[in-house]
């Protein structure tokens, strides 16, 4: 990874929830390159350990810790383990999140006759699936913040970054739970920024647009490599006309927000990184 922005994070302890995920693993690599000790919190420990080993092989310092961000006892145990291994947390990236098909609709629009049709409409959304998405994204941001922000109180240069989405501004069709959860993240980021403003903790968020990754490749491209119909709609609604580069264009924004020389007066904001998607009216 070639970083164009490289703040000095030596001596800092960075905690990344969902750290072995497709996007958050890029944050882990970037943080380690900047000199931070990185705690990779991941529900599947083996994935976190594989990433930590990769970081160490490249000269960085990282350890993996098992953590279910929706379970307070699991989060507390992870916090204690990180304290014992690395010391107090300086940087928290609340990266754990995701969607669940049980919380989706099959169609973009509800039409006459859909009640009787063999399709999943708004009225068929599974309650437990909806709760799962809200818990994973919103409660999964609340609980780690409650645990790790305690380490930051009254200390210089401590920062929390939440992961929102362009869904937070205008919800995408078919995914109401995920869109609602990310809208809540924007509001919560503002609340936290005000709440912690007197004790030296900055709180911001990034709102990624569409990035082509292995995780979403099947949704964006057909087996022959041609774009799906949904990809065509996405790119048509993205003024820059392309997908983002997670290595450069997400990690760069995160490192900027972590840079206390450049961003020390920035708190309570959510930065869209979406090629203009959230700004475009469609005409």
Where are the regions that the model predicts?
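Alpha-helical segment proximal to the catalytic Tyr-Lys
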Residues: 150, 194-195
């Amino acid at each position: 990874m070639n970083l164009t922005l490289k703040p000095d994070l030596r001596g800092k302890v960075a905690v990344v929830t969902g750290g072995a995920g497709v996007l958050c693993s890029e944050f882990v690599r970037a943080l380690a390159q900047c000199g931070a000790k990185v705690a990779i919190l991941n529900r599947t420990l083996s994935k976190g350990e594989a990433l930590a080993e990769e970081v160490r092989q490249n000269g960085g310092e990282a350890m993996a810790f098992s953590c279910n961000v929706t379970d307070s006892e699991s989060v507390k145990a992870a916090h204690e383990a990180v304290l014992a291994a690395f010391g107090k947390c300086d940087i928290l990236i609340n990266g754990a999140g995701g969607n669940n098909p049980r919380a989706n609709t099959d169609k973009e629009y509800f039409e006459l006759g859909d009640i009787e049709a063999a399709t999943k409409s708004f009225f068929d959304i599974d309650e437990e699936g909806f709760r799962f998405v809200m818990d994973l994204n919103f409660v999964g941001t609340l609980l780690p913040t409650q645990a790790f922000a305690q380490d930051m109180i009254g200390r210089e240069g401590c920062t929390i970054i939440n992961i929102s989405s362009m869904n937070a501004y205008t919800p995408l069709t078919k995914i109401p739970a995920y869109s609602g959860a990310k809208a809540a993240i924007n509001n919560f980021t503002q609340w936290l920024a005000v709440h912690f403003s007197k004790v030296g903790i900055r709180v911001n968020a990034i709102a990624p647009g569409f990035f082509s990754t292995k995780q979403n490749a099947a949704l964006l491209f057909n087996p022959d490599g041609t774009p799906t119909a949904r990809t065509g709609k996405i790119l048509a609604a993205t003024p820059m006309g392309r997908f983002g580069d997670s290595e450069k264009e997400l990690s760069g924004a995160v490192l900027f927000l972590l840079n206390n020389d450049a961003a020390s007066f920035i708190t309570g904001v959510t930065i869209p990184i979406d090629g203009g998607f959230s700004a475009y009216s469609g005409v």
